[in-house]
């Protein structure tokens, strides 16, 4: 079996190569250069150390090694999407778009098509049911990354391998240390890759500029201060508002009037909701329900967290609606609600959250 292993230089993808070799495979290692390019040139993830480590892994295990670039595709599919989403007052999820369109989309079209499987360091597993492949959760509930994979397709999941999905993070690090891999003690990556060391607000300002507006208390209508543009703020945000007498949380955004609405307190009721409307829904393997009336029991996530929330999903025309058993903090339009079966084992798919008041 011909396997392409996507290796970033981090501990997880490095251990993927070890696991594949232990299983008797001879993977070809690919390092994907991603980042962004505009008229002023590249703003890239710091890649030199990553490539050096990945090259060492390839030599250690005797694997073929290729460095490939998807800069332009990353700009078109991920960076532009992020900028446009923020401009529309939405909260983007670039990680989901990168997995769907870059790692398992453009890479597949250019190089992956020549391989039987693509292996990655995601904390996820696959489950075979009646000859069909389903995305399923990892052994490590804290590191589980199925929510970042909630937009992939049936054809993509059929081809994916997750060699560390059955391991705890501590086990992965132990393997890396035992094998003396240079990535054994590297910290996990944080934040949006294409920004590198660039501050997120500096990035937003570069492409959207500033537009001063009012910060208003939701309950009273009192003007509390000013902001530099609604696109610098997201629903549920607490830090960076510059207001005294806090804590303050961003509750709503009026993008037409450029107003940020906030509520005061450590746990304001206004930041919670129980209804999540999704604009369409993308199933990964297949629609397990078909046409149905009433509701289906599910678990779900609206952000990257170890916890699953229990609820029910309904179909209203083309709209899917999740009704949560418990109140959810910071339901942000633009983010994705990732849906699982009631036992939170199978990841069924996801839909983009729209304003729940509509």
UniProtKB/Swiss-Prot annotation:
GO terms for biological process: tRNA modification. SUPFAM superfamilies: Adenine nucleotide alpha hydrolases-like. The gene is mnmA. Residues 143-145 are annotated as: Interaction with tRNA. GO terms for molecular function: ATP binding; tRNA binding; tRNA-uridine 2-sulfurtransferase activity. It is an enzyme of class 2 (transferase). Catalyzes the 2-thiolation of uridine at the wobble position (U34) of tRNA, leading to the formation of s(2)U34. This is tRNA-specific 2-thiouridylase MnmA. Keywords: ATP-binding, Cytoplasm, Disulfide bond, Nucleotide-binding, RNA-binding, Transferase, tRNA processing, tRNA-binding. The keyword Cell division does not apply. Belongs to the MnmA/TRMU family. HAMAP family: tRNA_thiouridyl_MnmA. Its EC number is 2.8.1.13. It catalyses: S-sulfanyl-L-cysteinyl-[protein] + uridine(34) in tRNA + AH2 + ATP = 2-thiouridine(34) in tRNA + L-cysteinyl-[protein] + A + AMP + diphosphate + H(+). The active site is at residues 98, 193. It holds the Pfam family tRNA_Me_trans_C. GO terms for cellular component: cytoplasm. The keyword Transferase applies. The record marks 122, 335 as: Interaction with tRNA.
């Amino acid at each position: 079996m011909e396997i392409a292993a996507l290796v970033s230089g981090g501990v997880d993808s490095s251990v993927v190569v070890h696991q594949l070799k232990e299983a008797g495979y001879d993977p070809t290692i690919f390092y994907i250069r991603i980042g962004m390019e505009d008229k002023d040139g590249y703003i890239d993830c710091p890649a030199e150390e990553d490539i050096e480590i990945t090259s060492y892994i390839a030599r250690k295990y005797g694997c073929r090694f290729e460095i490939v670039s998807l800069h332009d595709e990353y700009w078109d599919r991920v960076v532009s999407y992020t900028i446009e989403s923020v401009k529309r007052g939405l909260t983007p999820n670039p990680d989901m778009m990168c997995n769907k369109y870059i790692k398992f989309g453009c890479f597949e079209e250019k190089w992956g098509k020549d391989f039987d499987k693509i292996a990655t360091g995601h904390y996820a597993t696959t489950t075979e049911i009646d000859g069909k492949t389903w995305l399923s959760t990892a052994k490590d509930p804290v590191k589980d990354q199925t929510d970042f994979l909630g937009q992939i397709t049936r054809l993509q999941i059929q081809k994916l391998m997750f060699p560390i999905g059955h391991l705890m993070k501590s086990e992965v690090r132990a393997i890396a240390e035992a094998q003396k891999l240079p990535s054994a003690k590297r910290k996990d990556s944080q934040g949006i890759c294409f920004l590198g060391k660039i501050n997120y607000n500096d990035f937003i300002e570069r492409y959207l500029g500033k537009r001063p507006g009012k910060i208003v208390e939701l309950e009273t209508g009192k003007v509390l201060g000013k902001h530099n543009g609604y696109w610098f703020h997201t629903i549920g945000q607490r830090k960076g508002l510059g207001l005294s007498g806090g804590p303050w949380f961003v509750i709503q955004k009026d993008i037409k009037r450029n107003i940020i609405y906030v509520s005061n307190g450590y746990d304001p009721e206004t930041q919670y909701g129980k209804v999540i409307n999704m604009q369409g829904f993308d199933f990964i393997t297949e629609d397990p329900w078909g046409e149905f009336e009433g509701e289906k029991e599910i678990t779900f996530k609206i952000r990257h967290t170890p916890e699953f929330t229990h609820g029910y999903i309904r179909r209203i025309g083309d709209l899917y609606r999740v009704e949560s058993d418990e109140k959810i903090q910071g339901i942000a339009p633009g983010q994705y609600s990732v849906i699982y079966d009631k036992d939170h084992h199978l990841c069924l798919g996801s839909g983009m959250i729209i304003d729940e008041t509509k």
